[in-house]
């Protein structure tokens, strides 16, 4: 593996970081921290899937940052475009709805959906990145896809349905 192999992964890292953080500036900082950590620990990486290793580093950094209080405020991030849109207004609305629905997923489901569906990682690699068993990846993916379907169809009830149990 070479530095060029790492550089080739930057677009995927940026996309995943943006989906995790929801903010372009924080995403770029997360990617930079990930690359800095990867280059500093280069000697620890053996053979294997470079993408999964980089995503593992990013995931761990993100979790650590989420646990600690945010000290830096990023003003002006709201002026940045959310996602690139295709030409038609209808497509832009569908993309916006999808991004909104994706953001409403629980974090555990959103991470798995992004890594498997968007970043094309295998279940095994996704499990390594997140530090969970493969079965957990599969169940989170199934629940996440179902929840996305419900959200996108708009069939989710406004109020939770309660069942009377006797």
Question: PLM features: what roles do these ranges have?
Answer:
Residues 1-15, 25-28:
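A short, charge-rich alpha-helical start-of-domain segment used by transcription regulators
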Residues 158-166:
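Short hydrophobic short-linear motifs embedded
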Residues 56-76, 91, 150:
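Arg/Lys-rich amphipathic alpha helix in sigma70-family domain 2
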Residues 32-39, 48-68, 141, 145:
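Σ70-family region 2.3-2.4 aromatic/basic alpha-helix that recognizes the −10 promoter
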Residues 130-154:
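DNA-recognition helix of helix-turn-helix
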Residues 68-69, 78-103:
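Acidic, proline/glycine-rich intrinsically disordered inter-domain spacer in sigma factors
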Residues 25, 124, 135:
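Residues within helix-turn-helix
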Residues 112-116:
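A short pre-motif secondary-structure segment
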């Amino acid at each position: 593996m070479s530095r060029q192999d790492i550089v080739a992964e930057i677009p995927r890292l940026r996309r995943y970081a943006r989906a995790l953080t929801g903010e372009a500036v924080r995403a770029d900082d997360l990617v930079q921290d990930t690359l800095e950590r990867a280059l500093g620990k280069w000697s620890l990486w053996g053979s294997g899937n470079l993408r999964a290793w980089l995503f593992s580093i990013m995931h761990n950094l993100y979790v650590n940052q989420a646990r600690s209080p945010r000290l830096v405020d990023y003003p002006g991030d709201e002026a940045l475009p959310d996602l690139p849109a295709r030409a038609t207004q209808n497509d832009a609305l569908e993309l916006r709805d999808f991004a909104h629905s994706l953001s409403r997923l629980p974090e555990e489901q959103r991470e798995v959906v992004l890594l498997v569906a968007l970043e094309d990682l295998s279940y095994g690699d996704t499990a390594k990145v997140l530090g969970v068993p493969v079965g957990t990846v599969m169940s989170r993916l199934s629940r996440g896809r179902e929840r996305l379907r419900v959200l996108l169809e708009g069939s989710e009830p406004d109020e939770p349905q309660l069942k009377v149990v006797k």
